[in-house]
């Protein structure tokens, strides 16, 4: 009611006033939804003194602590200048297991029609694969357009389109994974649980990492655009100001490294075991036309580069053939 709304507004104002004294190394942000407000305070930079005094052992491990040998993207903001770094090579042979294609004939990423055109192209690629495709978007708007377009285009192809937000993440991944498991698929068909031949999963930010789909379930990953950070995010803006104060370029020091890590995470959904094969399509020609594209390309595994759509379809045909003979 109105009284409760006024009370919440007063509480938010009080929190805002108290956070006005926070120093420039941190940022306070309040996010409001229909019934809840969430306030978070995040440090934009961490000096080594904040790690406390006395002997301590800190071990950080991840596939995406950085895209360079020094792992500066992770180490610098935490003040880990003296830390020992170790980079372990991937066990996967990406040059033979995966290929990359960047279409040059799509609308520019800033064009309002980009998502629609990309979705129509994807609908043609997934039919011979019988699904086995994940489309990762950089915005919820693109997610909605691509999901709707794919459902219309694939309505007669017996391919299910799974969409983030229509079920839990666990449920979506379980259903998608079931299509790649031939034994599970036959069993579920006999029980009337699976009616389609395959599936396409359309998802956004939360699926760019932490998704593990080894085997035949996933053989085509499509990233709609380069995952640049949202420019009006308060944390992004605060960090940019800190970098500018040091006389450095926020684009070079922050935007490109953040984008490289996100790109690496999204691409990492494709190959999850030594037996996997597949194609990564990035629907953003800036990767090959802009000067910074080379920097971002270095974040990707050493995959075979495909030049044309015909090359991509031929590669997919090889993936399908190998799957049918070994499945």
Residues of each region from the PLM?
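Intrinsically disordered, low-complexity repeat regions of secreted/extracellular protein precursors
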Residues: 35-39
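ASCE RecA-like P-loop NTPase motor cores
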Residues: 1-32, 42-327
């Amino acid at each position: 009611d109105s009284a409760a709304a006024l009370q919440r507004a007063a509480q938010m104002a009080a929190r805002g006033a108290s956070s006005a004294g926070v120093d420039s190394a941190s940022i306070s942000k309040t996010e409001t939804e229909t019934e809840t407000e969430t306030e978070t305070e995040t440090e934009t930079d961490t000096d080594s003194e904040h790690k406390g005094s006395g002997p301590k052992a800190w071990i950080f491990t991840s596939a995406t602590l950085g895209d360079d040998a020094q792992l500066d993207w992770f180490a610098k903001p935490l003040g880990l200048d003296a830390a020992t770094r170790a980079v372990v090579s991937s066990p996967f042979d990406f040059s033979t297991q995966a290929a990359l294609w960047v279409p040059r004939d799509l609308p520019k990423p800033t064009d309002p029609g980009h998502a629609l055109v990309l979705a129509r192209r994807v609908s043609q690629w997934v039919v011979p694969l019988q699904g086995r495709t994940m489309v990762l978007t950089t915005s919820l708007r693109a997610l909605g357009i691509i999901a709707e377009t794919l459902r219309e285009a694939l309505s007669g192809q017996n391919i299910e389109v799974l969409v983030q937000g229509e079920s839990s993440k666990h449920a979506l991944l379980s259903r998608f994974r079931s299509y790649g498991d031939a034994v599970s698929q036959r069993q579920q068909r006999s029980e009337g649980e699976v009616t389609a031949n395959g599936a396409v999963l359309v998802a956004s930010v939360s699926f760019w990492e932490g998704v593990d789909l080894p085997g035949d379930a996933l053989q085509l990953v499509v990233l709609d655009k380069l995952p640049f950070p949202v420019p009006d995010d308060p944390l992004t803006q605060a960090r940019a100001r800190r970098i500018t104060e040091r006389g450095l370029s926020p684009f070079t020091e922050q935007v490109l490294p953040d984008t490289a890590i996100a790109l690496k995470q999204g691409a990492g959904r494709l190959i999850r075991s030594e037996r996997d094969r597949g194609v990564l399509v990035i629907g953003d020609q800036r990767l090959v036309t802009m000067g910074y594209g080379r920097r971002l390309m270095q974040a990707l595994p050493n995959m075979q580069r495909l030049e044309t759509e015909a090359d991509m379809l031929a590669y997919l045909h090889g993936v399908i053939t190998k799957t049918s003979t070994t499945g």
